[in-house]
Amino acid sequence: MPLQYLKLEVQDYVATVTLDRPPVNALGRGIREELLATFDELHDRDDVRVVVLTANGRTFCAGADIKERIKLTGRPGEYRELNRLTREVFHSVIQCSKPVIAAVNGAALGAGFAITLCCDLLIASEHAEFGMPEVDVGLAGGVKFLQRFFTPSQARMLLLTGRRVPAAELYRLGVLQAVVPASELMPQAMKLAREIAQKSPLAVQMLKVSFNAVENLSLEDGYRIEQDKTIELSKSEDAQEAGQAFVEKRKPVFKGR
């Protein structure tokens, strides 16, 4: 798909997806369709092992495009169709076979906050802030995403007040892996991405699948799935190469097989 609202670059097994819809990277229908198509593509690409999601401008993503939303005609099913597209965008990030690192350069609000919470790892610049301001425009949403990262009382506070929370607070709560100066955001995100890209791509993908699969399971059921994946991995060429490299005291050369 030709990209109008996104930029995609791939280098050394790392894909960088950049939101590029000025002025605030609001999620209109067009950019949602591009996000869905792009993450579906990255899911299948053998030359990609890690994805970095970031944005151009001072705002990471201001959330849904309210101006576009109020222009909906009221056609039966229209709102549900748009919401389904939104869900599929989120699922395409969560279910992408490659780890996704959010490099948040500014405000991430509403659906913009939600899409960062779909990522596997989050890094933010010092001036970034996060919030779910749907209540301020007479809407509601984001409950399930916040439940994955916040206590019930913290999630209720964010949802009921629409308050914005600075990056430093989310780092204190363990939601963010790092908060860095703006000039260091992409270098740090790329450093982390390259570190992960050096690992066995099969093992990394299995780890992500396991995390997603066991998140809401009992300890017994979750551990069984994890063990099954480990057995499957042990038969791979990458696992054999890693063992041989350990014996020979050299770095393994992974092929993703």
Give the ranges of each region predicted by the language model.
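Terminal peptide-recognition signature
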Residues: V17, L35, L53, D65, ...
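Conserved CoA-thioester-binding segment of acyl-CoA-metabolizing enzymes
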Residues: M1-N56, H91
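A secondary-structure boundary/capping signal
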Residues: D20, T54-N56, A62, N105, ...
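Glycine- (often His-adjacent) and acidic-residue-rich active-site loop
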Residues: E33-E34, A55-S92, A108, S218
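Crotonase-fold acyl-CoA enzyme core
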Residues: S92-L202, D228, K235-S236, E241-Q244, ...
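C-terminal alpha-helix plus adjacent terminal tail
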Residues: M1-D12, R21, D44-D46, G162-A168, ...
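Beta-strand-connecting loop/turn residues
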Residues: D12-Y13, R58, A128, D228
